[in-house]
Every structure is written in structure tokens, then in C-alpha cells.
Amino acid sequence: MGAAALAGGAWAAGAYRARMAATETRLALRSHMAETRAGPMEYALAGQGRPLMMIHGTGGGFDQGLLFGHRLSETFQVIAPSRFGYLRSAFPSDASPAAQANALADLLDNLHIDRLSVAGGSAGALTAGEFAVRHPDRCTHLVLLVPAANLTGHDPVEFGALQRAAVDAVLGSDVAFWALASLAPRQMIRTLLATDPALLDRVDTAERDRAETILAQLLPISARTAGLRNDAHWSGTPSPIAWEDIAAPTLILSCEDDLFGTAATARLLADRIAGARLTIWPEGGHIWLGHDADVAREIAAFDGAAHP
């Protein structure tokens, strides 16, 4: 029994080291740095065409932004920043969505981009919304993808005691996150990605792989913890964003069974933003499982409608 336990421990340690080495390789040399009023900001570029900024969601970074926008890079030049507290980006004392929006304007100055479409997923929708409000002359189109926001004075995401304990256990610990993601990936997809894991059995291989990739790319979780906690605060706090002031053409996308309740949020936003278009699929969860191609198609058609 002792020898078996030692062997199992050695295997686990080796598997963990291999995963972290692969993660470091995946992140290395893919991103760039720019100076902003809030400090350094990490970003990556993919594709060619009209510029579109893809602002990642909770637990992300530039790598998640690239994944969210990978189909769009066939049509657009995707700019994928790491928001405050994620990977190599700064975490200033003011890490509000408004401050993040202003820092993104500085990033665009560095890239010599005057105007572009802006998409924000999950908690990234807060920053996208603030960008549209604060920099209306620079935002040609706005896409709010599974928007995580408190529009009613009631946090739409409520974890039970066991869920909260699990989340707290993995935040900041790469080992704990890796172990739980390896041993109970479906439970992690439900808890962290707010998606019914039963959907994995009803979608094609590419979509199952995408779900697994989103989960795997939360590593290193320790380099995203500040951003995760910041997102939890701002997405649960009553939104101060003047959504009614948004003038850019707006597309809002969600799934009815999103366990973070973004379908209800999407409907409220569609009522507040003049002329907003709304699409809600019956199922797909918070990572719109089974609808990645649909999301890309909706965004491309929406953005292209106003361009010759």
C-alpha cells in the first residue's frame, strides 16, 4: 500500500509539473506589453481585418480572449487584452470597470487604433459597457456576451456553502485547481463555468474540446486570483454603468440555462440600451456550449451590417 501511494504521488507530481510546463510554454511569447495610465497592460493580437477588441471574462486573460475570438480572427484583427489582475497586467488601487475602460483606451492609443468594435464576455461585459459610455467616439459596435452584471440590486450569482468552499480552495492554488480539474472536471465546469456538464454529451467533439480548454486555461490560477476576486466584487455589486447612455449599435447574446443567470441580465440590458439586438439560445450555459460558431456568425453579421 505504501509503495502504491508513493508511486501515485510521484505520478501526480509529475503530471502537475508537466501541465504547468505546458502552461508556461503556451503563454510564453504570445503576448505583448503596453503602458497605460493604470500601469502595464498585457495584450495579444490575432488575425487581420477590421479591429475588434475581445475583452475576456472571469478567470481569463489574453489567452481566454483569443479563445473567445478564435473564429472571429478569420474576419477581424482581434485585440485580446488581459484585464486588471490577470496574468501580467497591473492591478491598480482603482480596478473598477471604468478604470479598466480608460486603460483600454490607452492601449488603443499605443496600437494607433482610433475606432473599433468592442466585445466583452461575462464580467468583461462591464468593462466593454464602460468603454462604450466613456469613449463613444471610439466604439463602433458593442457586443455583450453572457453579460455578468447586477442590474436589480441582487447578485445574480449565489454560491451555496459547498460551492463557495470549493471556489475558495482553488483560488490562488495552482495545485488545488489542477487536482480538482483533473479529478472532477465536470463538477468544475458546472461550478466555475456555470454550464450544465450534461451538455458535453450533446455537443460535438470540437465543442467538448473547447469547454475543456476554457477550464484548462484557468491555469495558472494564481496569476489570475486578483482579477477573479475583483470580478466577483464588481459583477455582484449594483452596476453603476449608465447603460441607457450607450449610443453604439449593441448586440447582446446569452443562453437561457446559463447558471450565472445572464439570460435575465441580457433581457434587462436589451430594455435599457436603445435599439439593442438580443439573441438567447435555449441551452449552452455560460460558455455557450454548442453555439461557438453561432456566436461568431452573429457578431460578424452584426458588425458587417454597418460596413460596406
What are the roles of these predicted feature ranges?
Residues 42-88:
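Conserved HGGG/HGGXW glycine-rich cap/lid loop of the alpha/beta-hydrolase fold
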Residues 99-116:
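Conserved acidic catalytic loop of the alpha/beta-hydrolase fold
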Residues 120-124, 128:
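Gly/Ala-rich beta-loop-alpha elbow adjacent to hydrolase catalytic centers
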Residues 142-174:
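Flexible "cap/lid" loop of the alpha/beta hydrolase fold
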Residues 162-167, 171-241:
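Alpha/beta-hydrolase
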Residues 246, 252-254:
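Short beta-strand/loop motif that positions the catalytic acidic residue
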Residues 259-265:
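Conserved alpha/beta-hydrolase "acid-adjacent" motif
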Residues 276-308:
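Catalytic active-site module of serine/aspartate enzymes centered on a nucleophile-bearing elbow/loop
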